[in-house]
Every structure is written in structure tokens, then in C-alpha cells.
């Protein structure tokens, strides 16, 4: 075992390199990540550098605005309401004001009736609305006579230079009459209330703007938008880091942690890389901020620091969300929404001062803190003297506080990430209690004893009984893993599920132990517990005296443990060598030993030829080998392997077996498997688990003897043989022998184990019966498969050539009934009515595909959420405009209260409130006036001696300068230019002061208000709305109409084609749903547009029917355009987001281009014609811009132009439909039927001459080739084989070695000929790259043969074939559809009428016992049920040709047996035939009538199982178990004497295993005679002599595979998928 040292630094560097390689190799994702970020930067620079306005205002002296009555405008009328005696009296006195002489003043009964003013008067109307005698509000038309803003924002320009003069917004109140009207009305109210006239006093009030200090102001709304874009500037990076981290945590991080990965290394690796990205982006954003002068006075370093800290806080926020949310897309979406909403939450800080406590609390949300920081920088520009730069002279305490909060947020999010990562429940790993950090064991590592003694440790073995073989004495004291009363429970839907129920046993050093059991037995659960991935509910486990319940011990265990989980553990974007190097560093292998260790693993697993290939390009078997290689890195002392050879071809499987056998000394190896032969060959001890409990344990010989059914005698016959006489002969020697299988070519008997003494005489008589038709015979011992099934209480069939039907005669009636029922189901298909075809079938298929699309759409939450989000975004501008419209259309009052600007008495100083400065320049006291001011609840500061002028100190919001004499005061108002409503507020203060002097307790209150004029032109408004929502509508289609890419990836489209689907039916079925959904969305958008728009806008579109018809055509054309894109890029990624963005950009640029084009209407028309996404908005623009000039351009009338524009989208639809038809026709996939819409016919079976002549072929191959030639010549259709493959050859273009070399052709198959007869199943075997997959593809029509011909029953004569039955290796199923929905869809596609389909589905479901799964979605099914479903789909509709590719891969032995029974029942004595490919030799032996083995693209041999064993089998296997160990050496000498060429394979304890050449064994009678003598002489407990297995024959032939032909392994189209078992 290699020395290990876990180092956070080494692990962080390794993971950081991995992340960088991921970014480099996943160029599309990285490009998008950076592209969107740079586009944002570019947009901000180009847009805001021109749009953004910065007002740098120098210091200005005070400005005199003159007297109130200096207002002399005459272009207005005055209206007041309600008209009453009091209001009429007030307004009569108002008319006496000097500036109102001769003006019209009208009374109205109420405010609503004033709307008639807009109809009767074209001039401006001033509305006075009285609420009572002393309260009123002045209403002006919006944008007239008063500022549009209610109040100044803290960063906007309150004064600016206009025509070389300084103009302040607050002066509008003075200059445009508001203050004059206010003064007149106030004077009238005072006179009526007190009988004292103050008209002259108020008319003589003068206004002065205080001195203006220098300030820098931003350009209003543009600044707000810029800050919003700054808030989301890092969102692209943060989205991708959220997705990447969540994906890794979900799929692989737990396994890496089990290998020794430190959590801090994982977070650091991602944090450091994205911190670099943030650094670059922060630099760019700071440069943009400074260059666009968003921030003027603050230095670059401060701005950069703000952005950098904000970006870092977002990274840790993404980390936190990845822990709390388990789904990658949802994590990214939530983080983005949090950034947006928390950032927007900070916008009030731009306009007002927030309470300190609230601001500090909300700053715990980093986007809020960033927004506050940006607001502070802008306020500094607004408030600080322009000559005093922040970096040099100011201490930016507020900015530093904000930066501190961003640092605090970063640390807080990181701590919360680590905390929740430890306590939140996860699928794997140990979870801590919420208060784990309060325990001392968390902070201090306690020492431990070298040996932990368990209570009753010596009793940890299961209770001894006859089901458990006693452990050999030599292993006593070598207990490495001790398991005691282990239980594991999971939370089920209704109740707790027990996965393990008190498991007790030991695992020994120096032994290979196999865990066997059905799916769900608890094997994976046990291995996960032993590896530390899972925590047991109760019980204890020790591994070399380390207790798994202690975290410290788990870390120690990980140092000497290697784990190969059921799922592959590697990164697809890394090469084989890079994966090994990464995991070596994670495991803590010393840096100088990493390369040596990686090279060792590569060599031991013979991966030199794939070490530089990306893992994602490897086949499933090669990925499995890589996962095993990762497990053995560091030469671990304990190996835990969960199905380590699943998906491997036999040759690779044997390499791993040999590696494990060679390294088992001084090591502990525990593995689980569904491949029973693997356990039989490899494991020294087998442990059977059933439903979470141990059932038995022992060696193969022990288990076979106790639960085996005996020897299998297989006789290969010719036509002269009389089966009855042979059976009589066998029973003559062994009376209790049973005939278990009988066919024309084969008889199989079971001979009891205890009758081995009768074997010599039986075999001697069989040798003498060669003239009775026995060509050959063989014998094999019972298999562990049979033991397994017997333990499970199931019926068995033989894997070793027994055949199924004779065995069924010996099994219970239940299984016979089931299979008879299945045969009846399959035969009943012939009785059903003929399947439909032509247009009727096309309609049925369209409805079936539409059903699939609708059901998929219901479950595609990601797409639906995205569509909903886009729908919402598209109406944000309209919603804002609607709110704006509603806000200003309705009257809003704005109270002009002194509390807005001035402190109350006793109130603490609070920005922006100040004292009201009162300056007495009367030369006498003004106590009465001051007393009256104080009664208004205003804190005043009095300059009693008049030493100040009131205009040079802008630290006050306002000042009142009192002059005149003691009784007749004159007033001057000085206002701070930052306080917009200061003049009317102070005028009310003066008015109430005068009112108080006359001892009145009343209070005058003036409000400002506006009304909206309803005679605006909305044509531009309509186009601006349309400009936004229709481009957004175009971006919907990629999220709606690209689901076909998923069908191509899942191979569902290919499966549908093979099942007889018309290409046009597929696309029209998709369109039936997609077009409807898209049109519904478009219709909703139009309805929303009408709802949000003013009434005038609606009437611009005069013919709604035309718009709807145009929309239907537009929707159809855009959906089919997306179909064309999907078809072209069907082998790539979906990339809906990219295409959505592309459509959006195309439409926006088209709008801009048509608006700017110099050809006017003609350019708009041709733009609509040539740019499909622009068609709808172009048509609407055409309808709205039809004029005599445009009619002259086109030489058409208005109606003709409308109809022409209306036809454009339909023309596009037809064009894209035709393009789609051409693409389908040229895709080189063979159709099963003629398409009635696309008019595409199945290709004729063209014959291509083979350039190679067969040379040096075996006699069997030559005979098969002759059968093929004869079959092609037979004219009787009933005698034609169901599959004829004649001289098939397939060449692929190889890769160039360099730019100047020619492509070397890669030959996948060479002159392959065979035929499959009716009722026959032929097995096609071969090493990876031998050509099996290519042969299958040529038969299905996926690949066109270079030479040769394929003829399928139905395609050469008689009726058309219609469809094939195909059970692919990869489950081509839709995860969210149920079993019943799959069956109904495929029945419809294959042409079954609804009634026939229901009958067939019911019978098949009943026969295969799928009733309980009918309503279950496929994604919830076990692998075995999925394989059953794929098989049922392949035979549904009674196809004459069925192709089965690894039909039982991934199933447990029980499921495999059931599947094999079903396959045999399906094809026995029928008109159907099947071609089966498999890596599992037991499967071929169980179901195949004949087997063909391919080597290097050629058929190497073909024939029955027994024929191949006899012809190519070279060895017999002899196993012997001794009672007396002292006899071991003499026995060994005796075996070598009797069998001189015997080779000893295993020798430990009492078991001895030898390999005997065929020539030493033949005749069998002599061999058994010798062994019987040995049994008596040496007192053997038992022995067995068994013939070579098919697997051994295959391995011998596979050694001929040439290295150069292995290149097909690396072709992504040739992959073996690892099918996982689902266990609790």
C-alpha cells in the first residue's frame, strides 16, 4: 500500500487544475459565460457613455427671483370646485390680485365635471380644488407650471446651466405662477377668516435662491439603470458557478470525500478560479464606471474594491445556495433572482436616508450592500466639494463600513455553507447534529487504542447452521471487517423501509468475498455503509479495528480503502490519465509518486491505448474500467467493489479477475455482482443476501452440493437419432435421471450428484452409440445461478445448454401456466385484425406523437419556468408604462408640509431636516410673528439683529427674512436649491404666521397636484410596446420546439423510426402541441398588451382577425424553423438559451435596420419577407403604415398589400416544411414505410459487390454462407428466413494522422453472411469493436452497408415489413411517461387499432406481470422493469423480425431468468426470428439456438452451443474437496499421474482445482472411472468434472482480435452503457 498524506494544498491545486481544464475543454459553456459578460460590459460602455449625463456644477452666488406678483402670464384660465358660497367668496377676492386682473375664473360643482375644460379650452387651465375653507390643492396639467418630480433625488441635478444661465427646478414654482396663485388664495382665505387684508403683504414677498455650492449630479433614470446592470454584472459567472458546484456536489463530491477529499479544498478550488474571473470583471466594471463618469470624485481603487468584494460575496452566496438547493438549474435561477431582488431592495438608498438599524441589517444581503455602496459613491459626488478628492483628503467612513459589510457577508455565507453542508441530510455521507460545533470532539482529536474490543466480539459470525460453511482454520484471526447486527432503514412513502435487517458476518483478509442477491436485497446499501458513504441505523462495523461510527476513524479508513461504486466516478472532460492523476492527489498519494502510481494502474488494466482519450468519449465498459482503476490507486488494503465489471466485455472482465486474484493476499476484497458466474469463478466465499438478511455463505462447491440440481448431460444429435431409445439408455444406468430439454438437435438430462459412480458405465455406452445419431455429448456441473434461484424459491432454467422447455416440464404449474399464457398472447396477434396503414395510420401516429409531446411538456418544469419568466420579462416595460400612465392620469396630491424640510421643536438633528432660519431686519421685535411660527410646530433659529443675509449659508433648507416695521411686515424667502418644494412650503408658513398674528387658530394647507391630458398621440407608444414584446415572443420558440433533440439523444426517435413511424407524422405531431402552445402564449401576450394599453392604442389595429391570422402563420413558420435547426444540430446540445438569444437579437436588429433603412416602406416589406423571426412585427408595421405612397411602391391596393403581408408567414412555413422534408430524405436512415405526406419511400435493397473474397474460413462459416445464398434464391416466401445478411461490409473514414496524410479506411465488418430462420434466436457475440453494433445498425437501417445486402422478411416479397421489433441496449424511453403511456404510443405508431392495442397490451402486461407498474413513470422503475418494458415494446404488434441488444443487461439473476424464459417463449415455434447480441455468455447459452462469434469484423464461428464447445473447447475443470488435509500432497501426485497435463488453478484449505486438457479427459467414461477410484482411495468429500464453458471458448477466439481494430471502441456511436441496479 502506497504511503498517503492528505494535504489541503495538494487537493486544492489538483481540483483547481481540474476546473481550469473544464473551462478550457468545455469551450461552448466558457464562451457563453464570458460572451454574455463582455456583451454586458460593451453595452454599458457604448450605451451609457453616450446616454449618461454628468452635471458638474460650480459654485454660484444667490439668485433673486423678484416679487410674487411679478408673474404676468395671461395664457390660462382658472377653475375651482366645488362651487359654494364660501369658495365663490374666496375666489372673488382672489380675482383682486394684481396679476389676475381680467382673468376668467369659473366655478364647477365637482372636480370630475372639470374634464370638460379640455374640450372647451385650448389654453392651460389652473384648477383649484377645495377640501375645506382652509385646505385646497392646486392642480396643473402634468409637466406644466410645476416640476414633474415630487421631490429632488439625492443624486439628480437640481440646477443646471440653460442658455448660459443657471436654472433651478425649484424656481418653476415662482416663475410660472404656482406661488402667485398660492399667495392670492391664502390672502383671500385670511381676509375672509380675520377681516384683515394681507394681499399686499403676500404679493410683495420676494424669493431668493441661496448660494449654490459646487456639486456633481447624475443623469436621473440612466444612473438607476446603470446601477441595476452593475448589480447583475456578475450574474453570468455566478449562475455557472452555482450550476457547476451543485452538479459536482450532487453526483461526485460525496464519493470524493469518502476517498479523503477535504471539504475546504473543494470550496477553495471553485472559489479561487471564479475569484480570478471576478477580478477581471471587477477591473472592467470599475473602468466603465470611471470612464462613463458614474462616479467622478472617488478613485479607481475604491470602486474596484467595491466590485471585487461584491463579486466574492456572490460566489459564497452561490456556494450557500448550492448546499440548500439540490437541483443545478434551480440553484442558478434562485441565486440570480436573489441578486436582482436584493439589489433592487437597495434602490431607496439612492433617494433617501434609510434608518441606520434597517440599513445595517439589510446589508447582510450583499446585493443590497453593494447598491448602498454605489449610492454612497454617487452621494459623495453630489455632496462633496468638487476640488476635494476622496482618496486624498476625505475619510470615507460610510464606504469603508459598506466594504466591511461585504467582507462580513462573504465570511458569513461561507460559514453558513460549511455549517449547512454538515447538518443537512444528503443521499450519501455522515450528517452532524445542528450543535456539532459545541462538542469537544469537533475541536480536538482524541487518541484511541490500537485495538477496539467490541462487546461479544467473538460472537460476530452468524449463528452456525448447515446454510453457512465453517471458515477454514487458516483464516481464524484474520477477520478484517467485522459486521455486527447491522441495520439500515430508509424513509418510504408510507412507512420505513428496512434495507438491512441485523446483518452479522466477518470478512477475512486473504479472501475474495462476493455479495450476491436480487435487486434490492441490500448489497449496495451494505457496501455504501462499509465505505462510509452511508450511516447505519443501528449496529456496528469495524475495519481493521477502526470503528465506522467515528469521524476520525472514517478518515483513517479512507486512507487504506478503495471503493468502486455502482455509478462511474470520473470527470468526462478529463482524459483517463488526468482522471487517475486527479484522484491520486485527492487520495493523498505523495506528489513524487503520483505519476508512477498512475502509470502502474494504466499498465495493469491495459489502458495505454486510451490513456489520452477524454472519459466522455470512452465506451461504457472503458469508463467502468477507469472507475475500477481509480479504486485501486494507492494499492489499498481494503477493496470494496460494487459490480466492478458491469458492462465490460469478457476479455476485459477476465483481466480484472486475474488482477484481483493476484492481489488478494494480505488484502480484503469484497464485491457485489449480478453476474453469478463472476462470483463462481472469482470469489473464494459467496455470501447470499435476501431482503436485507443473510441467507447462506460458503464456497462454490459447498453451495452447489447443498442446493445444486446435479450434472447436465447434453447430447448433440443428427436426424438418425431416436430420442426415446437414448432416454431409455440413460435411465437404464441412472433411473432418476430427468429429460429437461428436447429439440431436433439436442437432448439434455439432469443427472443427480450422488450418482457419479454410475457415470463411467453410462458414458461408455454413449461412446458406443455413435451409430444411433449421437454426434457429440458433454457434461457440466450445476451452476451458481441455479443455486441462487433455488435459494430465492424460483424455478430455474439451465444456462449451460439445457434449453428451457424440458426444464419447464419439471417445474411447478405456475411457471408453465405463465409461459403458456405468454405463448397464447403472442399467437393471438395473428388473430387480430390487420394493422392500419396509409393516411389513417399517419393520423393515428400524429395523435400519438402529440400525446407524447404534451405529456413531456407537462413534466418539463425547467422549460415551463423559463417560458413563464420570459413571459413576465416581456411585459415589464408595458407594466411600468401602465403604472406610469395610471399614476399620472389620476390626480395625486402632494402635501406641502414644513415637516418635510424643518425640524420640530426638541427633535434631534436629522438629515436632511434643519432649523428654519428667521432673520429680523425690521429694527424692532417680531415676537408675535415668531410665536405664530412656533405654533406651527417648527424649530426656528432667530437672528434677532439681522446680521446675516440668509442667502449665503446653504446649511439651512430655508430662511425667512422679515423687514418693514413692527406692524407692517415685509417678507423675503430664501430657499436651498436642493429642496424642490421649499418656496410653496415657506409661503404657507408665512401665511399661517400672519393668520396666527390675527389670533386665528386655523391652519392653511396647500397641496400640489396634477391631472393628465387625454389627447396624446399614441402611435409611437404602440410601436414602442410592440418593439419589446414581439421580439421577446420570438425568443420563446427554442424553449418550446426543440424537444426533438432530447428524443435523438435518448435514441427514442430512432426507436420510433424502426417501429414504423412516418417522419412527417413525427414533426406534425410535435407541431400540434408546440404550435398550439406558442399561439396561446402569443394570444395571451396580445391580450395583455390590450389590457395594459390605453383605449386609444387598441383602436389603431382596426382588424383583429387579420392580426390573429398573421399570428397563426408566424407561429407555424417559426416552430418549423426551429425544427429545422433542431434537426441540423440533433447530435449536439439543446442550447435553447443560445437560440432564444439569437432570435431576440435578430428581431431587434431587424427593427432597427428597417427603421433606419433609406427605402422606407419597401425596405420594411422586404425585411418582413426575408427575416422569418421579424415577420410578425414587420406585418403589423406594414398594416399600420399603409399609405398611398406605399401602394405606389408595390403597385397594389391596400387590401392586396394586407393579403400579401398576411401570406408571408405561411410562405415561410411551406419553405421550412420543404427543407425539413429534404433533410429527412437525405439523412440516410432507412424507412419502414412510405411516408404519405413527405412522399419519402423506403430505399430499395441495393446490392453492392464486396471487394474481398472470403479466405481461410471455417467450414461452419462456409456452410452458413451457402445457406444464405440458397435462401436468397428461394422464391417460396413462406420458406424465406426472417433475416438474411449477405456479404455485409462496412467501411468508415478513419482519422488523418496529419494534414498531409490520407484518411485510412476503418473496416468495421468484412463479408459477414448469416441468416435467421423462423422460430430461431441467433446470438451474435464479440469483443468490443468486433463489429456487432455495426451489423445491428445495418439491419435496422441506421447505417448503409458499403457492400452486401440485408433482406428482412416482408421486404423481399409478400406484404411490406412495416416495422421491426428492436430492444436496444440503452433504454430508449421517456423518463416522465408511464409504462401504459409507452405501450399505447408504440401500439399506435405500429398501426394497431385502439381495440386491438388494448387487448394486446392487457395480455402482455398480464403475462409479464407488469400490472403494478402500469401507472408508474419510467424514471421510478428498476432496471429490470425497464428492460422488460423495452422487450415488450419490441414484440408489440407481432413483428416478424426482432433485434435484441443486451436484453437482460443490468438485471439480477432472477430477472434474467424471467427474461430468458420470455424470449424463448416469444420465438419458439413461431413465424418470428431474432438476432441477439450480448456480452453475457450465460444469456447466449440460455436462449440462443445458435451462436455466431465475431472477431475483427469477421464471423469466426457459428453453430449450436454444444457444437462450439466440442469444437473449440480445450479444457475440462476438475474440483475436489478433501476431508483429510493430510491427503493433499498424495492426491496432487495422483492427479498428475492420471492426467499428466493437468494444471493446478487453486489450492487453499481443503479445495483443489485443476484444468484438464480435452485429450486427457476423453473418453469421459474413463475420466469418471479414474475419478471414482480416486474418490474411494482418498476419501474425497466431493468432486466435479465440468466441460469448458462458452465463455472460455469465446475468450480463446477473442485473443485473435487485432489491436488496430479496437479503434471502434473510441467511436462515440459504439458504447456499452453501464446499467445500474436500484437498491435501497
Swiss-Prot record:
A GO term, aspect molecular function: ABC-type transporter activity
UniProt xrefs under PROSITE patterns: ABC_TRANSPORTER_2
EC code(s) of this entry: 7.6.2.-
Tissue: Widely expressed with higher expression in heart.
Protein origin, superkingdom: Eukaryota
Enzyme class label: translocase
UniProt binding sites for ATP 2: 1326-1333
Gene3D superfamilies linked: P-loop containing nucleotide triphosphate hydrolases
Membrane topology designation: Multi-pass membrane protein
Any one Pfam family match given in the protein's UniProt record, by short name: ABC2_membrane_3
SUPFAM superfamilies (alphabetical): P-loop containing nucleoside triphosphate hydrolases
InterPro entries noted in UniProt: AAA+_ATPase, ABC2_TM, ABC_transporter-like_ATP-bd, ABCA, P-loop_NTPase
Record field: transmembrane: 31-51, 221-243, 269-289, 300-320, 329-349, 354-374, 398-418, 864-884, 1026-1046, 1065-1085, 1108-1128, 1136-1156, 1163-1183, 1200-1220
Keyword rRNA-binding: no
Family named by the database record: Belongs to the ABC transporter superfamily. ABCA family.
Protein name as catalogued: ATP-binding cassette sub-family A member 9
Naturally occurring in which organism (per UniProt): Homo sapiens (Human)
Gene responsible for this protein: ABCA9
Amino acid at each position: 500500500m502506497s504511503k498517503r498524506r492528505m494535504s489541503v494544498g495538494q487537493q486544492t491545486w489538483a481540483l483547481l487544475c481540474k476546473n481550469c481544464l473544464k473551462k478550457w475543454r468545455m469551450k461552448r459553456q466558457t464562451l457563453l459565460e464570458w460572451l454574455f459578460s463582455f456583451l454586458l460590459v460593451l453595452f454599458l460602455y457604448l450605451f451609457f457613455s453616450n446616454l449618461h449625463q454628468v452635471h458638474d456644477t460650480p459654485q454660484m452666488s444667490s439668485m433673486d427671483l423678484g416679487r410674487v406678483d411679478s408673474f404676468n402670464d395671461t395664457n390660462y384660465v382658472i377653475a375651482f370646485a366645488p362651487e359654494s358660497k364660501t369658495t365663490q367668496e374666496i375666489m372673488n377676492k382672489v380675482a383682486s390680485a394684481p396679476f389676475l386682473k381680467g382673468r376668467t375664473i369659473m366655478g364647477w360643482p365637482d372636480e370630475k365635471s372639470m374634464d370638460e375644460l379640455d374640450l372647451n379650452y385650448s389654453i392651460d387651465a389652473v384648477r383649484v380644488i377645495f377640501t375645506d375653507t382652509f385646505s385646497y390643492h392646486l392642480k396643473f396639467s402634468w409637466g406644466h407650471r410645476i416640476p414633474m418630480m415630487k421631490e429632488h433625488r439625492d443624486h439628480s441635478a437640481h440646477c443646471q446651466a440653460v442658455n448660459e444661465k443657471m436654472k433651478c427646478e425649484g424656481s418653476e414654482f415662482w416663475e410660472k405662477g404656482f406661488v402667485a396663485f398660492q399667495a392670492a388664495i391664502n390672502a383671500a382665505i385670511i381676509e375672509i377668516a380675520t377681516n384683515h387684508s394681507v394681499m399686499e403683504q403676500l404679493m410683495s414677498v420676494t424669493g431668493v435662491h441661496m448660494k449654490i455650492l459646487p456639486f456633481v449630479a447624475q443623469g436621473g433614470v440612466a444612473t438607476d439603470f446603470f446601477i441595476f446592470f452593475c448589480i447583475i454584472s456578475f450574474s453570468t459567472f455566478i449562475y455557472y458557478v452555482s450550476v457547476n458546484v451543485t452538479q459536482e456536489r450532487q453526483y461526485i463530491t460525496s464519493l470524493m470525500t469518502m476517498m479523503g477529499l477535504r471539504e475546504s479544498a473543494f470550496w477553495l478550488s471553485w472559489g479561487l478560479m471564479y475569484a480570478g474571473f471576478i477580478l477581471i470583471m471587477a477591473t472592467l466594471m470599475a473602468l466603465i464606471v470611471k470612464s462613463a463618469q458614474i462616479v467622478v470624485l472617488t478613485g479607481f481603487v475604491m470602486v474596484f474594491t467595491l466590485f471585487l468584494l461584491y463579486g466574492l460575496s456572490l460566489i459564497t452566496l452561490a456556494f450557500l445556495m448550492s448546499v440548500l438547493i439540490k437541483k443545478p438549474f434551480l440553484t442558478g435561477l434562485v441565486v440570480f433572482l436573489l441578486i436582482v431582488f436584493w439589489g433592487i431592495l437597495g434602490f431607496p438608498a439612492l433617494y433617501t436616508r434609510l434608518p441606520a438599524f434597517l440599513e445595517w441589517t439589510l446589508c447582510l444581503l450583499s446585493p443590497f450592500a453593494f447598491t448602498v455602496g454605489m449610492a454612497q459613491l454617487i452621494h459623495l459626488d453630489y455632496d462633496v466639494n468638487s476640488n476635494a478628492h476622496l482618496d486624498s483628503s476625505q475619510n470615507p467612513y460610510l464606504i469603508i463600513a459598506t466594504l466591511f459589510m461585504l467582507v462580513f457577508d462573504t465570511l458569513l455565507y461561507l460559514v453558513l455553507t460549511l455549517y449547512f453542508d454538515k447538518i443537512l441530510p444528503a443521499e450519501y455521507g455522515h450528517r452532524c447534529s445542528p450543535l456539532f460545533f459545541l462538542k469537544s470532539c469537533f475541536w480536538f482529536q482524541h487518541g484511541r487504542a490500537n485495538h477496539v474490543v467490541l462487546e461479544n466480539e467473538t460472537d460476530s459470525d452468524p449463528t452456525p447452521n448447515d446454510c453457512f460453511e465453517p471458515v477454514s482454520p487458516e483464516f481464524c484471526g484474520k477477520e478484517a471487517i467485522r459486521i455486527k447486527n447491522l441495520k439500515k432503514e430508509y424513509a418510504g412513502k408510507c412507512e420505513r423501509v428496512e434495507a438491512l435487517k441485523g446483518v452479522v458476518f466477518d470478512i477475512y483478509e486473504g479472501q475474495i468475498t462476493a455479495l450476491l442477491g436480487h435487486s434490492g436485497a441490500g448489497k449496495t446499501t451494505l457496501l455504501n455503509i462499509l465505505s462510509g458513504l452511508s450511516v447505519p441505523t443501528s449496529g456496528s462495523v469495524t475495519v481493521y479495528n477502526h470503528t465506522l461510527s467515528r469521524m476520525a476513524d472514517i478518515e483513517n479508513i479512507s486512507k487504506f480503502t478503495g471503493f468502486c461504486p455502482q455509478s462511474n466516478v470520473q470527470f468526462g472532460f478529463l482524459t483517463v490519465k488526468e482522471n487517475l492523476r486527479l484522484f491520486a492527489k485527492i487520495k493523498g498519494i505523495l506528489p513524487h509518486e503520483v505519476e508512477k502510481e498512475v502509470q502502474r494502474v494504466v499498465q495493469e488494466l491495459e489502458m495505454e491505448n486510451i490513456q489520452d482519450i477524454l472519459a466522455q468519449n470512452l465506451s461504457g465498459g472503458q469508463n467502468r474500467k477507469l472507475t475500477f482503476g481509480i479504486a485501486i490507486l494507492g494499492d489499498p488494503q481494503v477493496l470494496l467493489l460494487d459490480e466492478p465489471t458491469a458492462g465490460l466485455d469478457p476479455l476485459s472482465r477476465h483481466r480484472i479477475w486475474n488482477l484481483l486474484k493476484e492481489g488478494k493476499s494480505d488484502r480484503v476484497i469484497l464485491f457485489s455482482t449480478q453476474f453469478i458466474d463472476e462470483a463462481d469463478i472469482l470469489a473464494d466465499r459467496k455470501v447470499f443476501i435476501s431482503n436485507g438478511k443473510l441467507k447462506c455463505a460458503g464456497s462454490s462447491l459447498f453451495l452447489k452440493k447443498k442446493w445444486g440440481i446435479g450434472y447436465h448431460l447434453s447430447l448433440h444429435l443428427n436426424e438418425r437419432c431416436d430420442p426415446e431409445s437414448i432416454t431409455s439408455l440413460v435411465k437404464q444406468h441412472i433411473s432418476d435421471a430427468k429429460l429437461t430439454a428436447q429439440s431436433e438437435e439436442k437432448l439434455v438430462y439432469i443427472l443427480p450428484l450422488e450418482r457419479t459412480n454410475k457415470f463411467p458405465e453410462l458414458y461408455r455406452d454413449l461412446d458406443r452409440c455413435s451409430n444411433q445419431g449421437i454426434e457429440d455429448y458433454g457434461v457440466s456441473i450445476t451452476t451458481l445461478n441455479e443455486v441462487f434461484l433455488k435459494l430465492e424459491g424460483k424455478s430455474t432454467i439451465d444456462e449451460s445448454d439445457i434449453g428451457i422447455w424440458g426444464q419447464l416440464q419439471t417445474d411447478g404449474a405456475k411457471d408453465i401456466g405463465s409461459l403458456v399464457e405468454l405463448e397464447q398472447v403472442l399467437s393471438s396477434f395473428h388473430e387480430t385484425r390487420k394493422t392500419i396503414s396509409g393516411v389513417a395510420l399517419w393520423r393515428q401516429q400524429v395523435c400519438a406523437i402529440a400525446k407524447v409531446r404534451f405529456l413531456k411538456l407537462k413534466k418539463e418544469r425547467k422549460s415551463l419556468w423559463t417560458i413563464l419568466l420570459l413571459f413576465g420579462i416581456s411585459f415589464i416595460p408595458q407594466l411600468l408604462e401602465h403604472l406610469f400612465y395610471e399614476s399620472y392620469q389620476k390626480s395625486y396630491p402632494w402635501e406641502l408640509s414644513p415637516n418635510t424640510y424643518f425640524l420640530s421643536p426638541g427633535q434631534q438633528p436629522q438629515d436632511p431636516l434643519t432649523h428654519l432660519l428667521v432673520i429680523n431686519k425690521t429694527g424692532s421685535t417680531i415676537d408675535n410673528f415668531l410665536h405664530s411660527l412656533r405654533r406651527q410646530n417648527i424649530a426656528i433659529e432667530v437672528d434677532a439683529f439681522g446680521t446675516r443675509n440668509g442667502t449665503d449659508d446653504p446649511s439651512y433648507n430655508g430662511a425667512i427674512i422679515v423687514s418693514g416695521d413692527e406692524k407692517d411686515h415685509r417678507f423675503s424667502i430664501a430657499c436651498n436649491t436642493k429642496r424642490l418644494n421649499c418656496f410653496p412650503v415657506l409661503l404657507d408658513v408665512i401665511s399661517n404666521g400672519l393668520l396666527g398674528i390675527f389670533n386665528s387658530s386655523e391652519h392653511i394647507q396647500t397641496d400640489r397636484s396634477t391631472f393628465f391630458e387625454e389627447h396624446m398621440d399614441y402611435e409611437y407608444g404602440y410601436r414602442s410596446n410592440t418593439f419589446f414584446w414581439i421580439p421577446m415572443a420570438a425568443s420563446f420558440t427554442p424553449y418550446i420546439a426543440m424537444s426533438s433533440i432530447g428524443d435523438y439523444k435518448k435514441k427514442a426517435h430512432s426507436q420510433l423510426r424502426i417501429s414504423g413511424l412516418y417522419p412527417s407524422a413525427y414533426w406534425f405531431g410535435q407541431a400540434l402541441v408546440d404550435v398550439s402552445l406558442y399561439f396561446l402564449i402569443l394570444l395571451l401576450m396580445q391580450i395583455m398588451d390590450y389590457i395594459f394599453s390605453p383605449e386609444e392604442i387598441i383602436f389603431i389595429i382596426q382588424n383583429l382577425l387579420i392580426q390573429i391570422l398573421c399570428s397563426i402563420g408566424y407561429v407555424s413558420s417559426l416552430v418549423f424553423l426551429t425544427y429545422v435547426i433542431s434537426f441540423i444540430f440533433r447530435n449536439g446540445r439543446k442550447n435553447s438559451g443560445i437560440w432564444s438569444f439569437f432570435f431576440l437579437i435578430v428581431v431587434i436588429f431587424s427593427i432597427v435596420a428597417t427603421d433606419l433603412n433609406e427605402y422606407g416602406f419597401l425596405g420594411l416589406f422586404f425585411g418582413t419577407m426575408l427575416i422569418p423571426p421579424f415577420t410578425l412585427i414587420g406585418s403589423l408595421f406594414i398594416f399600420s403604415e399603409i399609405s398611398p405612397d406605399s401602394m405606389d411602391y408595390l403597385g397594389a391596393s391596400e387590401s392586396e398589400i394586407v393579403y400579401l403581408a398576411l401570406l408571408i408567414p405561411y410562405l415561410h412555413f411551406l419553405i421550412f416544411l420543404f427543407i425539413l422534408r429534404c433533410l429527412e430524405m437525405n439523412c440516410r436512415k432507412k424507412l419502414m414505410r412510405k411516408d404519405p405526406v413527405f412522399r419519402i419511400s423506403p430505399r430499395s435493397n441495393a446490392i453492392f459487390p464486396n471487394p474481398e473474397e472470403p479466405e481461410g474460413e471455417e467450414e461452419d462459416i462456409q456452410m452458413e454462407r451457402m445457406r444464405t445464398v440458397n435462401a436468397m434464391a428461394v422464391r417460396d416466401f413462406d420458406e424465406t428466413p426472417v433475416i438474411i445478411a449477405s456479404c455485409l461490409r462496412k467501411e468508415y473514414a478513419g482519422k488523418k494522422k496529419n494534414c498531409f496524410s490520407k484518411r485510412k479506411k476503418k473496416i468495421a465488418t468484412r463479408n459477414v453472411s448469416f441468416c435467421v430462420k423462423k422460430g430461431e434466436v441467433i446470438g451474435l457475440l464479440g469483443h468490443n469493436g468486433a463489429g456487432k453494433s455495426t451489423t445491428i445498425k445495418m439491419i435496422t437501417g441506421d447505417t448503409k452497408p458499403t457492400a452486401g445486402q440485408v433482406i428482412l422478411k416482408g421486404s423481399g416479397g409478400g406484404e411490406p415489413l412495416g416495422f421491426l421489433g428492436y430492444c436496444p441496449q440503452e433504454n430508449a424511453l421517456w423518463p416522465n411517461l408511464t409504462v401504459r403511456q409507452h405501450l399505447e404510443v408504440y401500439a399506435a405508431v405500429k398501426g394497431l387499432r385502439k381495440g386491438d392495442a388494448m387487448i394486446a397490451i392487457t395480455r402482455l402486461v398480464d403475462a409479464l406481470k407488469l400490472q403494478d407498474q402500469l401507472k408508474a413513470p419510467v424514471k421510478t422503475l428498476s432496471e429490470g422493469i425497464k428492460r422488460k418494458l423495452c422487450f415488450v415494446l419490441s414484440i408489440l404488434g407481432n413483428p416478424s423480425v426482432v433485434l435484441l441488444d443486451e436484453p437482460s443487461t443490468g438485471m439480477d439473476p432472477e430477472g434474467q431468468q424471467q427474461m430468458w424464459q420470455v424470449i424463448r417463449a416469444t420465438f419458439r415455434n413461431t413465424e418470428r426470428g431474432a438476432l441477439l447480441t450480448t456480452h453475457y455468455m450465460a444469456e447466449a447459452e440460455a436462449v440462443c439456438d445458435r451462436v455466431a462469434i465475431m472477431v475483427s469484423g469477421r464471423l469466426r464461428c457459428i453453430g449450436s452451443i454444444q457444437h462450439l464447445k466440442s469444437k473449440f473447447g480445450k479444457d475440462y475443470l476438475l474440483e475436489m474437496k478433501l476431508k483429510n488435509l493430510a491427503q493433499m500432497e498424495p492426491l496432487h501426485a495422483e492427479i498428475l499421474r492420471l492426467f499428466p497435463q493437468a494444471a493446478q488453478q487453486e489450492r487453499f484449505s481443503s479445495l483443489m482445482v485443476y484444468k484438464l486438457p480435452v485429450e486427457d479427459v476423453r473418453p469421459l467414461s474413463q475420466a469418471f472411472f479414474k475419478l471414482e477410484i480416486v474418490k474411494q482411495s482418498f476419501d474425497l468429500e466431493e468432486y466435479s468434472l465440468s466441460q469448458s464453458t462458452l465463455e472460455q471458448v469465446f475468450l480463446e477466439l477473442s485473443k485473435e482480435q487485432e489491436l488496430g481494430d479496437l479503434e471502434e471502441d473510441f467511436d462515440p456511436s459504439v458504447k456499452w452503457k453501464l446499467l445500474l441496479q436500484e437498491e435501497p
